[in-house]
Amino acid sequence: MVAKNVKTFALGVEYDGSYYHGWQRQKILPSIQEEIEKALSIIANHKIDVVCAGRTDAGVHSIGQVIHFKTTANRKKSSWSIGVNSYLSENISVVWVKEVTENFHARYSAITRSYRYIIYNYSLRSAIFQTKLNHIYRKLNVDKMNFEAQFLLGEHDFTSFRALGCQSHSPWRNITKLNVFRFHNWVVVDITANSFLHHMVRNIVGSLIEVGISKKKEYWIKDLLEKKDRSHAGATAPAKGLYLVYVEYPLHFNLPRSAYTSIFFK
């Protein structure tokens, strides 16, 4: 797109990932990217391609996804939010829109990405939140989980926590925040890093769960990190408990931040 009147927009997007085969466009299966591009293309009256901050897997949700696109269409700002939402299903929503400079890139301009994993830790399962939380009936020791989690802070080789099919050239990532806490019957894992390997968050959570049910001894996470071997780690935690909650950008872009709903315990 080389026209002089090209504009670049950033959008904040929420979605319930239960109904889609992940963010990325698929040949046959439904994807969030495809649905958003269709709706934007209708409003723009030309084909729109979007770029996201983080490509979430099938079943993963978001309240903080950020995307950008370029367009030659001259539309009101509300057309890119209210108008687009009118063409989206109820489980996807644009929550803010901002015109940005042409050098903004949803993926490459991002400084950090924050995820939240939510576990319903109760003896009986929830019918209401069946596709929104991971149910663990055995009592989790949150203090142990949080203690072990701190060994993952900083820049490390996270080979032990990457998917076997991960295509990233480097296993090194920098985790700047990793906290585990309890809120009544919910156990929450908050994690922030510069970027993540494929399944990295869910593999970390799966291993922390084994710590929480006292299946592993103290310092197991530390040893696991040093082994650099995925086969020694815990099972990948289900996607349904994972939320992309926030993407941090340089302040000069002045992007809005989506407000947490009550389920996110703010």
Swiss-Prot record:
The active site is at 57 (nucleophile). CDD domains: PseudoU_synth_EcTruA. This is tRNA pseudouridine synthase A. One of its GO terms (biological process) is tRNA pseudouridine synthesis. It comes from Buchnera aphidicola subsp. Acyrthosiphon pisum (strain APS). It is an enzyme of class 5 (isomerase). GO terms for molecular function: RNA binding; tRNA pseudouridine(38-40) synthase activity. Keywords: Isomerase, tRNA processing. Substrate binds at residue 115. SUPFAM superfamilies: Pseudouridine synthase (SSF55120). Homodimer. Belongs to the tRNA pseudouridine synthase TruA family. NCBIfam families: hisT_truA. InterPro entries: PsdUridine_synth_cat_dom_sf, PsdUridine_synth_TruA, PsdUridine_synth_TruA_a/b_dom, PsdUridine_synth_TruA_C, TruA/RsuA/RluB/E/F_N.
